[in-house]
């Protein structure tokens, strides 16, 4: 026999009441444990906020002051001084060591990686660039592309091609993405992977038609297709 609406309502209300009773009973039986858990959460959150405000924030401010000279040397292509300092001001390596938890310390890894690449120390460059955590999509794309450049110099073309494609896809834009795809296509041709090369070139043509790389992309597509 079907239950009446009142019976259904009473059953639902009774179930809810029982659930609330069980919850209240659980809280009452575990009051000490729950209090400890809540206090632990408060302590953890408070410690984290205090760490950020009282420790990291002043360190960040100091790091920003310290990195200025190294950035100036970097802009002048004085990469050794940028990396190691000049005796009066810190270089990127010292800033990484002294201020690693900060955003500036992270940025110093990017600068260090590019500096080592320019000095021909490709393994060191890759190490620093891989440890760099990009916050800006454009800088991230350039960093991954720089890793690929180093792999090319080391003769590791498979890794280079993968990194160029990764760089092109990371924060896709009309400037760096077609550059990275063009480099990827060239490396794929070096590897004899002409299908992948055509795919990279076709992507430039389809997705970045107004880029500088797209102006003469047809001849690269034709060349790769002829080698298939």
Predicted features, each with a name:
Residues 2-40:
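N-terminal positive-inside, membrane-proximal cytosolic segments immediately preceding the first
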Residues 57, 96-105, 119, 133-141, ...:
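Short solvent-exposed coil/turn linkers within tandem alpha-helical repeat scaffolds
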